[in-house]
């Protein structure tokens, strides 16, 4: 009798665990990152190495779309503001931009964004 009770308890625990894991799976999200120049690098800088970048649209006006794993929506924590720290340099384009934003804005994250021939360092931070 004790063995059956233990088996029922284990089976119930397993069912609860599997259904909980299934609910926490992340969805796929898309974000447009502007023109296609350095699309893959910008996508990975913003959403990590597991994201997928693609360029599509009309010839001459290809736009960068980044697909990444996103979880359920987070509860509102306040506003997210944007700022900048100038231009991204060729010496250290992405890491330096992120570092500059972290130093300039409390909780800031940075990424390089191309617009025409210019490569701007854009920051997002809680405000």
Swiss-Prot record:
Assigned GO CC terms: extracellular region
Main location: secreted
Disulfide bonds: 29-70, 36-55, 39-64, 43-66, 81-127, 92-112, 97-121, 101-123
InterPro entries hit by this protein: LCR
Domain of life: Eukaryota
Signal peptide per UniProt: 1-26
Keyword Disulfide bond: yes
This protein's UniProt keywords: Antimicrobial, Disulfide bond, Fungicide, Plant defense, Secreted, Signal
Subcellular location: Secreted
GO biological process, one term: killing of cells of another organism
UniProt-listed PANTHER family: DEFENSIN-LIKE PROTEIN 181-RELATED (PTHR36788:SF4), DEFENSIN-LIKE PROTEIN 183 (PTHR36788)
Family note: Belongs to the DEFL family.
Record-given protein name: Putative defensin-like protein 180
Source species of the chain: Arabidopsis thaliana (Mouse-ear cress)
The encoding gene: LCR58
